[in-house]
């Protein structure tokens, strides 16, 4: 077996061009396709989720294999349900065929969608026959994946009666729902919260427009981690293409890492303008980190590793959705951290 030895540099002084936001890219692509426009959004992410959506939308094969891309599976399920006159089978990897999709399928069926399972009930593959859906009032649990909710919202403007989506119980990942609504409005939709638990989407078609995707705050988290671990005031990392006031849920990384000593400085704070962000280590760290990741669960892994290496005790909550990703991320964290000598304990699969 080949072994590699990785050594940290003596000094960090780098400018990094981050990848485009996967979350915004995937939403913008679906909305662009629903607008039936010809101007593809600019600066799209090159991640697997985005690539399989681009391929499916461009080639339109009868059987669409979205591989291990969970976002693509959920967004394309809704999208194909409103493509009048088209029929497709939506499938993926073996792991994807064991990831539940029944909540979304049931909700779409309530709106009139023609979707059937070709294998095990409640799981992909799906056979979807697109048609004009009526819309109206729909209730779903607020604690389901925000991708299910976003998938339903994005087709709202195409429904004859629009969509009134009522979320029952505790609402998790609200920033991702807000990101979807914001992206929809960028393309002309009338969609917003009408009460704490209800979202109203008017039956107003999307309009085509040029659109530039800002860079990814999730990708920024690893550079924040490097600065936090560097323990040197002279170290500096510059990240290009980020926005102050970003709607990305993972933009909370700047606040959380401030608790671990990383200072964030924006070149400009003009709204809607991507700019360069400078990171420095102040060497001031909280003695213990407590945080609820319910609104940004994908950041949890970065902070588990970072806190462990910094010897900062931590207690993280809001991690229930990590169990049903492309792998069980909580078990993977426990397994890999154990190899480094750290013992993690999870409670109720959510903290």
Q: Where is each model-derived feature located?
A:
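Short, structured segments at the rim of ligand-binding sites
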Residues: 1-351
């Amino acid at each position: 077996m080949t072994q590699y030895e990785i050594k940290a540099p003596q000094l960090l002084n780098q400018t990094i061009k981050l990848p485009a936001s996967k979350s915004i890219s995937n939403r913008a692509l679906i909305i662009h396709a629903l607008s039936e426009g010809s101007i593809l959004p600019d600066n799209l992410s090159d991640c697997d989720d985005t690539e399989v959506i681009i391929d499916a939308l461009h080639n339109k094969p009868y059987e669409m294999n979205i591989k291990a891309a969970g976002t693509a599976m959920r967004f394309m399920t809704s999208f194909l349900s409103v493509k009048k006159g088209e029929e497709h089978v939506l499938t993926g990897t073996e792991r994807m065929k064991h990831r539940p999709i029944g909540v979304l399928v049931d909700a779409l069926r309530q709106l009139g969608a023609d979707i059937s399972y070709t294998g095990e009930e409640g799981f992909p593959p799906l056979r979807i026959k697109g048609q004009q859906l009526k819309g109206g009032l729909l209730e779903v649990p607020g604690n389901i994946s925000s991708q299910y909710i976003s998938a339903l919202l994005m087709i709202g403007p195409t429904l004859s009666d629009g969509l009134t989506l009522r979320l029952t119980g505790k609402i998790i990942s609200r920033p991702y729902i807000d990101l979807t609504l914001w992206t929809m409005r960028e393309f002309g939709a009338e969609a917003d919260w009408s009460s704490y638990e209800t979202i109203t989407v008017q039956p107003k078609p999307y309009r085509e427009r040029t659109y530039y995707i800002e860079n990814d705050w999730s990708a920024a988290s690893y550079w924040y981690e490097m600065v936090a671990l560097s323990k040197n005031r002279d170290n500096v990392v510059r990240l290009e293409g980020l926005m102050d006031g970003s709607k990305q849920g993972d933009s909370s990384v700047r606040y959380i890492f401030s608790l671990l000593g990383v200072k964030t400085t924006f070149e400009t704070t003009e709204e809607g303008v991507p700019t360069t962000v400078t990171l420095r280590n102040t060497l001031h760290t909280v003695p213990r980190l407590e945080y609820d990741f319910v609104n940004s669960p994908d950041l949890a892994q970065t902070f588990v590793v970072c806190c462990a290496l910094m010897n900062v005790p931590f207690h993280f909550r809001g991690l229930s959705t990590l169990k049903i990703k492309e792998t069980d991320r909580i078990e993977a964290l426990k397994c890999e951290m154990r190899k480094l000598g750290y013992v993690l304990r999870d409670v109720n699969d959510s903290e």
